[in-house]
Curated annotation (Swiss-Prot):
Zn(2+) binds at C143, C146, C181, C184. One of its GO terms (molecular function) is zinc ion binding. Homotetramer. The keyword NADP does not apply. Keywords: ATP-binding, Cytoplasm, DNA synthesis, Kinase, Metal-binding, Nucleotide-binding, Transferase, Zinc. This is Thymidine kinase. It catalyses: thymidine + ATP = dTMP + ADP + H(+). HAMAP family: Thymidine_kinase (MF_00124). It is found in: Cytoplasm. The lineage of its organism: Bacteria, Bacillati, Bacillota, Bacilli, Bacillales. Pfam families: TK. The gene is tdk.
């Protein structure tokens, strides 16, 4: 029986590398995967997933008007698994489409993404994945500053000062965001 998985973690918890690993494992067994990513995330190039260790792979970009269910339903042969990167950027309707892929097409869907933003609020995609996923799995990493478990994301400005207000989405990497524990989120030891 297919299920909808939400594998969430802070930055640097290995979400993208895990997608690449899962895709490789399916393909090693001559099974097919459909890989999607947010069209918002243009750090490297729209339509690609890219890990911080340098591995990169093409993926179908998701925009506001993208119907993920229709795309997957029309793939021949039917994929054995659907993988999504940056799923925090999904909209509510996209999450419903993922559930429909699982329920109507009997294809497992594994969505990877951040749970909460730099203000420690849920992203829309994460909120609905937390509500609708059959299985929730935390991917762990350590705090940038103290090595406790990182559960939050700290945003810094161009001068390295912590930022706790502003637009939820600002695409960036390690130059503007850090995985942190709760204590270091509130009082980051930044010099």
């Amino acid at each position: 029986m297919a299920q909808l998985f939400f594998r969430y973690g802070s930055m640097n918890s290995g979400k993208t590398i895990e997608i690449l690993k899962v895709a490789h494992n399916y393909e090693e067994q001559n099974k097919t995967v459909a890989i999607f990513t947010s069209g918002i995330d243009d750090r490297d190039q729209v339509g690609f997933i890219s890990s911080r260790i340098g591995l990169k792979r093409e993926a179908t970009p998701i925009f506001s008007d993208t119907n993920i269910f229709e795309i997957v339903a029309n793939i021949k042969p039917k994929p054995n698994c659907v993988l999504l990167d940056e799923s925090q950027f999904l909209e509510k309707e996209h999450v419903f489409q993922l559930a429909k892929i699982v329920d109507d097409l009997n294809i497992p869907v594994i969505a990877y993404g951040l749970k909460n933003d730099f203000r420690n609020e849920l992203f829309e995609g994460s909120k609905y994945l937390l509500l609708y996923a059959d299985k929730l799995e935390e991917m762990k990493t350590i705090c940038w500053f103290c090595a406790k478990k990182a559960t939050m994301v700290l945003r810094v400005d161009d001068k390295g000062k912590p930022v706790y207000t502003g637009e939820q989405i600002m695409i960036g990497g390690n130059d503007h965001y850090y995985p942190v524990c709760r204590k270091c989120h509130a009082n980051p030891p930044i010099k």
